[in-house]
UniProtKB/Swiss-Prot annotation:
Gene: ispD
Source organism: Burkholderia vietnamiensis (strain G4 / LMG 22486) (Burkholderia cepacia (strain R1808))
Lineage, opening ranks: Bacteria, Pseudomonadati, Pseudomonadota, Betaproteobacteria, Burkholderiales
EC number: 2.7.7.60
Protein's name according to its UniProt entry: 2-C-methyl-D-erythritol 4-phosphate cytidylyltransferase
UniProt catalytic activity: 2-C-methyl-D-erythritol 4-phosphate + CTP + H(+) = 4-CDP-2-C-methyl-D-erythritol + diphosphate
Annotated site, Transition state stabilizer, chain positions: R17, K24
Length: 236
């Protein structure tokens, strides 16, 4: 049986670094909620069985009317961290018939620059891989190490062989669930899914991402994201 594709969008964060009282995923960009662009990209990929959005149980900002016409489901099962929200979402996918051998693509709600082309490139590259992998970009900038709380450069780090992780991150549902459970048992709260897979002893792959698929984090990022979303996506 051919494994099916599911998308999981953890959307339980508060976006404290974005400088807004409204969680960043609900901020308006180019006339639409930031989250809308992510949902629209996956909605355009009809090969996905379901897209599941994981909200915090007490989320009062989500308004389904802002996403009318898009195909997705919502569950209020967000946890205290990204790792916990993803785990709860993985467990929730069983409600839609997902099995351990099906693929899940976990994507940050705050990366509105994702496109159907990027999603399909990731799937086409990894669909026969025993582990899975992530969208990523080779590091282009020179990296400086600075002690926590200081401003003096301790040394320059080599950027050779370094990649900047993006999302979606694509893994088998069972493998990712078990990897996160193992990390939890061993007291680790990891910041992305690939880290959990690595912690479990597997080797994820990287697939070339795009600069447009950056994560909106700081106040100045909103203007940049709006400019990108207003421009044609081309082949990215």
């Amino acid at each position: 049986m051919t494994p099916r594709l599911f998308a999981l969008i953890p959307c339980a964060g508060t976006g404290s670094r974005s400088g807004s009282a409204v969680p960043k995923q609900y901020r308006t960009l180019a006339g639409r909620a930031l989250l809308h662009y992510t949902l629209a990209a996956f909605d355009a990929c009809s090969e996905f069985a379901q897209t599941l959005v994981v909200l915090a149980p007490d989320d009062t900002h989500f308004d389904a009317r802002r996403f009318a016409g898009l195909r997705f489901a919502v569950r209020r099962c967000g946890g205290g961290s990204r790792q916990a929200s993803v785990l709860n979402g993985l467990l929730g996918l069983a409600e839609f018939g997902a099995t351990d051998q099906d693929w899940v693509l976990v994507h940050d709600a705050a990366r509105p620059g994702i496109t159907p082309t990027l999603i399909r490139t990731l799937v086409a590259t990894l669909k026969d891989d025993p582990v899975g992998g992530i969208l990523a970009l080779p590091v282009a900038d020179t990296l400086k190490r600075v002690p926590t709380g200081g401003d003096a450069i301790a040394r320059t780090e080599s950027r050779d062989a370094l990649w900047q992780a993006q999302t979606p991150q694509m893994f088998r549902i069972g493998m990712l669930r078990d990897a996160i459970l193992r990390a939890q048992r061993e007291g680790h709260d990891l910041t992305d899914e690939a880290s959990a897979i690595e912690w479990a002893g597997h080797t994820p792959r990287v697939v070339q991402g795009s600069l447009r698929n950056f994560k909106v984090t700081y106040p100045e990022d909103f203007a940049l994201a709006e400019a990108i979303l207003a421009a044609p996506a081309h082949a990215s």
